Amino acid sequence: MRTSILSMLALGAAAVSAAPAAAAAPAELVERGSSCTFTSASAAKAGKKSCSSIVLDNIKVPAGETLDLSNLKSGTKVTFKGETTFGYKEWKGPLIRFSGKNIEVNGASGHVINGGGASWWDGKGTNGGKTKPKFFYAHSLDDSTITGLNVKNTPVQGFSVQADNLVLDHITIDNTDGDKTNGGHNTDAFDVGESTYITISNANIKNQDDCLAINSGENIIFTGGTCSGGHGLSIGSVGGRDDNTVKNVTISDSTVSNSDNGIRIKTIYKAKGEVADVTFSNIELSNIAKYGIVIEQDYENGSPTGKPTTGVPITGLTVEKVTGSVKSSGTDVYILCGSGSCSDWTWSGNKVSGGKTSSKCKNVPSGASC
């Protein structure tokens, strides 16, 4: 239904003459009907509402500025072309911002969005050192799609998703340049919060933190992903925010390699919230350094305490066909639950090996194994 609505909007937009664009130098804007090609961030910001189709052509975003595609008119299509780059400045970002309804964002053949992360990387991420800009805010980007983007070297976190009914398909993030000493840190690929009906499919991620982190939200799908170099596929940390519910999530048919963790759920010590009806299915792990499967209810200030609490129950969890290898120095499975706060779990077809068997699991629910 959404596809047909978008098609009707596009046909309607083509029949209507565009409103005059804000003044811009000829080199910065080429406008044909309601189709616009922008070659500067300032021209895009000034003229975006006059266009139903936008091409961002080799834009060099000035230091400390956002490539601002917020509040687009409904039905707008935006294409990244060539290389998009960003000047260096210590600030919080974001480097790119999109919002609107029925928006289509895509990348032309051969394009790259180069975050220039090496200019900021110092091995500390958001925990100190240089102030680093977040990369891409998809906030209030509803009933929309982001497809086929090629991203390189985000300074810290990649896509921040806070939206309703958003599809992100075939997103590539390559942060392998950050694997060096004092390189990238906290380079999460997708951080999802306060969102509903989000689908992330066919992602190809190489980074130094979570491939996926769902902090809150409902009806979320992650499928067909390839994750390497980071911290794996994560729910949480859950708790301590305005929205502390994660519900109806499916993470499936994906691979995690050369990462600290395979799959994990972490909830905040003494916080309140809920993790319900989460499924991990058909996940292949390889060369995992710390934990193949880790579920713990003891996080405080970003680190485990070893003392689980019960304020964020984990119920209706399904872990099935999670298989693969952990390094000998790692742990295959670790489950640390509060008394009675993990229940109604389904655990089947899982085979994680190569690491140690934990002696510290606690309150493991019926059916699960540790």
Swiss-Prot record:
Record GO terms (molecular function): polygalacturonase activity
Major enzyme class: hydrolase
Pfam families the UniProt entry points to: Glyco_hydro_28
Location in or out of the cell: Secreted
PROSITE patterns with a match to the protein in the record: POLYGALACTURONASE
Gene Ontology CC entries for this record: extracellular region
Protein name as annotated: Polygalacturonase 1
Gene: PG1
